């Protein structure tokens, strides 16, 4: 299916996989998929680049304001009221991430999005030795999967998916995370043993019942558009969804957009488990 959509991905047996990542533990290694065109991006730098370009195109940013209410009249959006003022607009996009449900309720509606805590960490910089991101989708004690990669600065960035999920807004680091992820990482790449960890942190994923985003118009309030529940894939999905939302809000949908919106409809029947990891 991935190849049918143009993705360059292939299965490599253990011997060929070790040619790509020589430092993998060979004992018990069967193989894995490899996508040479994959990469990573700095969320901070990417966000700032989008911010600067948006300003060049005339976008106005208001930082440090909390939306208290989505204003409506006659079943249609009129704008938003914040703790610092009122802004009138014919359309409001709910893209509030883990706070999506809170904002939806400020509009008198609801969305099935809950915040899910995930922890990550970063090491000291070391000489370059790792090219692709390593993703281990095998479940382990306390975790569903984990990944790590080497940043261009030489630091190793790593994250784990807790199992069961930790629902809530607690962003405090835990004492369980580092020992758990270290055991798993060293199990497949012993070379990491002596690298020092600089810091860990905890953030929130906005999760939906089936692990796919909720994108489309709100039926209960005309002019309210939903772009919520990216489930940890927001940075990857953002550019494409941003263009789709622009076309949706301005009534300029292209062929194929309606099929995408149907698949991501906030009103779809939720079945199965999370598909995106």
Region roles according to the model:
Residues 45-56, 108, 190-191, 247-250:
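Oxidoreductase and adenylate-handling cofactor-binding alpha/beta cores
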Residues 186-277:
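C-terminal catalytic lobe of FAD-dependent flavoproteins
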Residues 1-20, 145-146, 166-167, 176, ...:
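Dinucleotide-binding Rossmann-like beta1-alpha1 core, especially the glycine-rich loop
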Residues 1-16, 26, 111-113, 252-259:
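A short alpha-helix-loop-beta-strand transition element characteristic
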């Amino acid at each position: 299916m991935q190849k049918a959509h143009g993705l360059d991905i292939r299965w490599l047996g253990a011997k060929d996989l070790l040619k790509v990542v020589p430092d993998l533990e060979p004992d018990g290694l069967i193989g894995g998929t490899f996508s040479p065109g994959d990469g990573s991006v700095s969320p901070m730098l990417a966000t700032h680049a989008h911010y600067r370009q948006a300003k060049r195109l005339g976008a106005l940013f208001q930082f440090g304001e909390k939306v208290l209410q989505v204003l409506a009249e006659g079943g249609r959006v009129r704008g938003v009221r914040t703790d610092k003022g009122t802004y009138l607009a014919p359309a409001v996009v709910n893209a509030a991430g883990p706070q999506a449900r809170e904002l939806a309720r400020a509009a008198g509606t609801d969305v099935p999005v809950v915040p899910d805590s995930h922890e990550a960490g970063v090491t000291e910089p070391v000489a370059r030795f790792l090219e692709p991101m390593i993703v281990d989708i095998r479940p382990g004690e306390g975790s569903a999967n984990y990944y790590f990669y080497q940043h261009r600065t030489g630091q190793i960035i790593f994250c784990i998916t807790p199992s069961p999920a930790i629902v809530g807004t607690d962003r405090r680091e835990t004492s369980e995370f580092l020992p758990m992820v270290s055991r798993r990482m060293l199990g497949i790449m012993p070379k990491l043993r002596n690298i020092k960890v600089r810091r860990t942190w905890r953030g929130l994923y906005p999760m939906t019942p089936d692990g796919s985003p909720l994108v489309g118009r709100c039926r209960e309030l005309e002019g309210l558009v939903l772009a919520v529940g990216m489930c940890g894939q927001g940075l990857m999905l953002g550019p494409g969804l941003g263009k789709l939302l622009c076309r949706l809000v301005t009534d300029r949908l292209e062929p194929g957009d309606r099929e995408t919106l149907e698949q991501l409809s906030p009103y779809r029947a939720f079945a199965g488990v999370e598909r995106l990891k």
